[in-house]
């Protein structure tokens, strides 16, 4: 039987509050993270992802207190990212109640950190977040046409996004959180080309992120190769039964959901 597609609300947190902007700019307050996490748990979410959107840029530590309070309220897997630099942060997150840690900027700066974390805790604990954007005129071209960015999409690296996902998979990362910076917050749908390219390169689960606006946007991402689908504003600002609507759309397209 096919593995069920996971539906994952994402909580972007800044100073203890959930926010959501378009293309990571102009953040808007979407509420209390613990309250929202509780709502999503009750609403049928399969997992939650919690990203401290200021941690890497402002070099601040992840808000461990919010993680602890969230973990006390929800009983579905919780992935936490933002400011994760190595074994010490992952250890602390797990102790505060996270199930998985997501790493981005620190892994780009020092890929060996992937090996260190997976050796210490196992692959299942580590998610590599890849903030990919299409290369633009004047950028260093990449063979896939997508480059890795860091610091919430603000800094281009010139690293090929598909090659980076493959390297991380080879190093033992458990899954890839594949976020399209171009599609993020637009509500125009996922970047299907990006998903297809990474799916062809790796054998580990892919969580598609960036661009969801309506339930109909989710099945094409699964068809393109995503094992899980992640979104923020469509859940934060949509009707209370949005997770159920998304699962119905995926099920109606012929895919298994939980």
UniProtKB/Swiss-Prot annotation:
Pfam family, one: His_biosynth
GO MF, one annotated term: lyase activity
GO CC terms of this entry: cytoplasm
Localization (cell): Cytoplasm
Catalysed reactions listed for this entry: 5-[(5-phospho-1-deoxy-D-ribulos-1-ylimino)methylamino]-1-(5-phospho-beta-D-ribosyl)imidazole-4-carboxamide + L-glutamine = D-erythro-1-(imidazol-4-yl)glycerol 3-phosphate + 5-amino-1-(5-phospho-beta-D-ribosyl)imidazole-4-carboxamide + L-glutamate + H(+)
Keywords: Amino-acid biosynthesis, Cytoplasm, Histidine biosynthesis, Lyase
Highest taxon, organism lineage: Bacteria
A biological-process GO annotation: L-histidine biosynthetic process
Enzyme Commission code(s) on record: 4.3.2.10
InterPro entries given in the database record: Aldolase_TIM (IPR013785), His_biosynth (IPR006062), HisF (IPR004651), IGPS_HisA/HisF (IPR050064), RibuloseP-bd_barrel (IPR011060)
Annotated active site: 12, 131
Family in the record: Belongs to the HisA/HisF family.
Function: IGPS catalyzes the conversion of PRFAR and glutamine to IGP, AICAR and glutamate. The HisF subunit catalyzes the cyclization activity that produces IGP and AICAR from PRFAR using the ammonia provided by the HisH subunit.
Subunit: Heterodimer of HisH and HisF.
Protein name stated in the entry: Imidazole glycerol phosphate synthase subunit HisF
The species this protein was found in: Paenarthrobacter aurescens (strain TC1)
């Amino acid at each position: 039987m096919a593995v069920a597609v996971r539906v994952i609300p994402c909580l972007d947190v800044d100073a203890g509050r959930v926010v959501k902007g378009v293309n990571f700019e102009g953040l808007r307050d979407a509420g209390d993270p613990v309250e929202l996490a509780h709502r999503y748990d009750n609403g049928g979410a399969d997992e939650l992802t919690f990203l401290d959107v200021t941690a890497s840029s402002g070099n601040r530590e992840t808000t461990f207190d919010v993680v602890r309070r969230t973990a006390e309220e929800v009983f579905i897997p919780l992935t936490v990212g933002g400011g994760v630099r190595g074994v010490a942060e992952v250890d602390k997150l797990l102790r505060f109640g996270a199930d998985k840690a997501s790493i981005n900027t620190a892994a780009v700066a020092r890929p060996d950190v992937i090996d260190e974390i997976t050796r210490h805790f196992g692959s299942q604990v580590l998610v590599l977040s890849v903030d990919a954007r299409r290369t633009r005129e004047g950028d260093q071209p990449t063979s896939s046409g997508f480059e890795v960015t860091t610091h919430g999409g603000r800094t281009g690296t010139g690293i090929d996004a598909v090659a980076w996902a493959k390297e991380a998979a080879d190093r033992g990362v458990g899954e890839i959180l594949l976020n399209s910076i171009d599609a993020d917050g637009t509500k125009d749908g996922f970047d299907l080309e990006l998903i297809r390219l990474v799916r062809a390169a790796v054998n580990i689960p892919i969580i598609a992120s960036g661009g969801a606006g309506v339930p109909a946007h989710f099945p094409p991402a699964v068809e393109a190769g995503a094992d899980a689908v992640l979104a923020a504003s469509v859940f934060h600002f949509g009707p209370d039964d949005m997770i159920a609507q998304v699962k119905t759309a995926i099920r109606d397209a012929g895919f298994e959901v939980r």
